[in-house]
């Protein structure tokens, strides 16, 4: 069990989990607020 904890706390695994969460969050934000990065010309 200690080896599994050591593996899950390594940088590539944590980076993959973080980027997965971040990508999902950005996808959900774009689903509810589409084109939020485009400034409308008023």
From Swiss-Prot:
UniProt xrefs under SUPFAM superfamilies: Subunit IX of photosystem I reaction centre, PsaJ (SSF81544)
Pfam (any one): PSI_PsaJ
Membrane disposition: Single-pass membrane protein
Keyword Plastid: yes
Entry's Gene Ontology BP terms: photosynthesis
Region forming the signal peptide: none
Stated family: Belongs to the PsaJ family.
Function summary: May help in the organization of the PsaE and PsaF subunits.
Official protein name in the record: Photosystem I reaction center subunit IX
Organism: Staurastrum punctulatum
């Amino acid at each position: 069990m200690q080896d599994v904890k050591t593996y899950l706390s390594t940088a590539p695994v944590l980076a993959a989990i973080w980027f997965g969460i971040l990508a999902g969050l950005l996808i959900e934000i774009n689903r509810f607020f589409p084109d939020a990065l485009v400034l409308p010309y008023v």
